[in-house]
Amino acid sequence: GFKYTHGTPFRRAIEENLIDPKKYVILGLRGALYDPEDLSWAREQGVTIITIDDYYEMGFNKCIEKIYEVLVNTDTYFTFDIDGIDPTFAPGTGTPEVGGFNVREAQTIIRALNKINFVGGDVVEVSPPFDVNNMTSLVGATIAFEMLCTMTKVN
Protein backbone atom coordinates (compact mmCIF):
# COMPACT_ATOMS: atom_id res chain seq x y z
CA GLY A 1 0.00 0.00 0.00
CA PHE A 2 0.82 3.66 0.06
CA LYS A 3 2.57 5.26 3.03
CA TYR A 4 0.67 8.55 2.77
CA THR A 5 -3.11 8.31 2.38
CA HIS A 6 -6.20 10.09 3.69
CA GLY A 7 -6.38 7.32 6.32
CA THR A 8 -2.87 7.74 7.75
CA PRO A 9 -2.21 11.41 8.63
CA PHE A 10 -2.28 10.86 12.37
CA ARG A 11 0.01 7.83 12.22
CA ARG A 12 2.48 9.91 10.22
CA ALA A 13 2.12 12.78 12.72
CA ILE A 14 2.94 10.39 15.58
CA GLU A 15 5.92 8.96 13.67
CA GLU A 16 7.20 12.49 13.07
CA ASN A 17 6.69 13.47 16.76
CA LEU A 18 4.12 16.11 15.85
CA ILE A 19 1.48 14.80 18.27
CA ASP A 20 1.69 12.93 21.56
CA PRO A 21 -0.01 9.56 21.10
CA LYS A 22 -0.80 9.40 24.81
CA LYS A 23 -2.94 12.53 24.34
CA TYR A 24 -4.75 11.26 21.26
CA VAL A 25 -8.25 9.76 21.30
CA ILE A 26 -10.06 8.01 18.46
CA LEU A 27 -13.80 7.61 19.09
CA GLY A 28 -16.22 5.60 16.98
CA LEU A 29 -13.84 3.51 14.91
CA ARG A 30 -15.61 0.71 13.09
CA GLY A 31 -15.75 -1.28 9.88
CA ALA A 32 -12.98 -2.40 7.62
CA LEU A 33 -9.46 -1.07 8.06
CA TYR A 34 -6.92 -0.55 5.32
CA ASP A 35 -4.35 -2.27 7.49
CA PRO A 36 -5.30 -3.88 10.82
CA GLU A 37 -1.66 -3.46 11.86
CA ASP A 38 -2.31 0.29 12.04
CA LEU A 39 -4.74 -0.28 14.91
CA SER A 40 -2.29 -2.47 16.84
CA TRP A 41 0.49 0.01 16.19
CA ALA A 42 -1.61 2.92 17.47
CA ARG A 43 -2.46 1.09 20.68
CA GLU A 44 1.22 0.21 21.20
CA GLN A 45 2.04 3.92 20.92
CA GLY A 46 -0.49 4.75 23.64
CA VAL A 47 -3.37 6.05 21.52
CA THR A 48 -6.74 5.71 23.26
CA ILE A 49 -9.09 3.96 20.86
CA ILE A 50 -12.78 3.69 21.69
CA THR A 51 -14.48 1.72 18.94
CA ILE A 52 -18.17 2.14 18.25
CA ASP A 53 -18.72 -1.21 19.99
CA ASP A 54 -16.70 -0.02 23.01
CA TYR A 55 -18.79 3.16 23.12
CA TYR A 56 -22.09 1.29 23.31
CA GLU A 57 -20.68 -1.22 25.79
CA MET A 58 -19.20 1.48 28.06
CA GLY A 59 -22.10 3.88 27.73
CA PHE A 60 -22.06 7.61 27.13
CA ASN A 61 -20.92 8.75 30.60
CA LYS A 62 -18.00 6.33 30.95
CA CYS A 63 -16.88 7.14 27.43
CA ILE A 64 -16.85 10.87 28.14
CA GLU A 65 -14.99 10.24 31.43
CA LYS A 66 -12.34 8.26 29.55
CA ILE A 67 -11.86 11.07 27.05
CA TYR A 68 -11.46 13.58 29.88
CA GLU A 69 -8.90 11.33 31.61
CA VAL A 70 -6.75 11.43 28.49
CA LEU A 71 -7.21 15.07 27.51
CA VAL A 72 -7.37 16.82 30.89
CA ASN A 73 -5.22 19.98 31.03
CA THR A 74 -4.13 19.56 27.41
CA ASP A 75 -4.41 21.94 24.49
CA THR A 76 -6.40 19.81 22.06
CA TYR A 77 -7.10 19.93 18.35
CA PHE A 78 -10.47 18.41 17.43
CA THR A 79 -10.87 16.61 14.11
CA PHE A 80 -14.31 15.24 13.32
CA ASP A 81 -14.35 12.72 10.48
CA ILE A 82 -17.81 12.84 8.91
CA ASP A 83 -17.69 9.12 8.19
CA GLY A 84 -18.08 8.63 11.95
CA ILE A 85 -21.72 9.45 11.23
CA ASP A 86 -23.80 6.62 9.82
CA PRO A 87 -24.24 7.03 6.04
CA THR A 88 -28.00 7.03 6.55
CA PHE A 89 -27.48 10.60 7.80
CA ALA A 90 -24.24 11.54 5.97
CA PRO A 91 -23.81 9.58 2.74
CA GLY A 92 -21.49 12.10 1.09
CA THR A 93 -18.11 10.73 2.10
CA GLY A 94 -15.49 8.70 0.33
CA THR A 95 -15.51 5.88 2.88
CA PRO A 96 -19.06 5.32 4.15
CA GLU A 97 -19.33 2.67 6.88
CA VAL A 98 -22.69 1.49 8.18
CA GLY A 99 -23.17 1.44 11.94
CA GLY A 100 -21.96 4.90 12.90
CA PHE A 101 -23.32 7.55 15.21
CA ASN A 102 -26.52 9.37 14.41
CA VAL A 103 -26.37 13.16 14.32
CA ARG A 104 -27.99 13.62 17.73
CA GLU A 105 -25.46 11.28 19.35
CA ALA A 106 -22.61 13.24 17.77
CA GLN A 107 -24.06 16.54 18.98
CA THR A 108 -24.45 15.18 22.51
CA ILE A 109 -20.88 13.87 22.58
CA ILE A 110 -19.44 17.15 21.30
CA ARG A 111 -21.44 19.19 23.83
CA ALA A 112 -20.23 16.97 26.66
CA LEU A 113 -16.62 17.80 25.81
CA ASN A 114 -17.03 21.49 26.66
CA LYS A 115 -14.45 21.43 29.47
CA ILE A 116 -11.63 20.33 27.18
CA ASN A 117 -9.32 23.11 26.03
CA PHE A 118 -9.86 22.94 22.29
CA VAL A 119 -7.49 25.21 20.38
CA GLY A 120 -8.82 24.41 16.91
CA GLY A 121 -10.69 21.88 14.89
CA ASP A 122 -11.99 20.72 11.56
CA VAL A 123 -14.59 18.52 9.93
CA VAL A 124 -13.06 16.21 7.33
CA GLU A 125 -14.09 13.75 4.62
CA VAL A 126 -17.23 15.63 3.49
CA SER A 127 -17.44 14.93 -0.24
CA PRO A 128 -20.23 16.88 -2.00
CA PRO A 129 -19.98 14.81 -5.23
CA PHE A 130 -21.10 11.77 -3.22
CA ASP A 131 -23.76 13.64 -1.26
CA VAL A 132 -27.51 13.15 -1.52
CA ASN A 133 -29.68 16.29 -1.28
CA ASN A 134 -26.86 18.12 0.56
CA MET A 135 -27.48 15.93 3.63
CA THR A 136 -23.79 15.48 4.47
CA SER A 137 -23.01 19.14 3.91
CA LEU A 138 -25.77 20.09 6.34
CA VAL A 139 -24.58 17.53 8.90
CA GLY A 140 -20.98 18.74 8.47
CA ALA A 141 -22.04 22.36 9.01
CA THR A 142 -24.06 21.33 12.08
CA ILE A 143 -21.09 19.44 13.52
CA ALA A 144 -18.77 22.39 12.83
CA PHE A 145 -21.24 24.71 14.59
CA GLU A 146 -21.39 22.38 17.61
CA MET A 147 -17.60 22.23 17.72
CA LEU A 148 -17.30 26.02 17.60
CA CYS A 149 -19.87 26.39 20.38
CA THR A 150 -17.98 23.87 22.49
CA MET A 151 -14.66 25.59 21.81
CA THR A 152 -16.10 28.91 22.92
CA LYS A 153 -17.94 27.26 25.83
CA VAL A 154 -21.38 28.21 24.46
CA ASN A 155 -23.76 25.28 24.97
Which residue stretches match the model-derived regions?
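Conserved alpha-helical scaffold segments that buttress catalytic/binding sites
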Residues: 1-155
